[in-house]
Amino acid sequence: NIIVMSEGEVVQAGTPKELFERPNTTFVGYFIGSPAMNLFESEAISDNSVKINNSIIKTNTNLTSLKNKKVKLGIRSEFIKIADNQKNNLLDVNVDKVEDLGNYKLLTAKMGNLTIKSKINRDTEVPLSNAKLHIPAEKCCVYSDEKLI
């Protein structure tokens, strides 16, 4: 197990997979992994969906008690992909830059004032200007007051 501390306090203990995929706090999400977890200011709008700018993202988190409240949606860059034929959980983005890092490409995109990072397969064709990114519901982490719901 790994223990993550902040300001002398244990904030999470768990396996590397647990810390990476389900960080208990936004601090752990930011601290573990490279690049850091994408964290988006959003609003809980239904039992399990959030709104980021004008995009609706469905999650597997019960948000009933937080409806119409501000939350943060966290997702790792490894889980964000360029959309194929998915119809839901899409972000319309402007491609900012693509870095070829050998075994993968790091896509940096903008959606309004948000910056989104995605690690994509090195063989994937990346659109030069606009793209749709898919956010899988099962990989979303939703935070309220910086803590995982």
Give the label of every model feature segment.
Residues 1, 19, 98-101:
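Beta-strand-rich soluble domains of envelope-associated proteins
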Residues 1, 13-14, 22:
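Short, glycine/charged-rich "phosphate-handling" switch motifs in NTP-dependent
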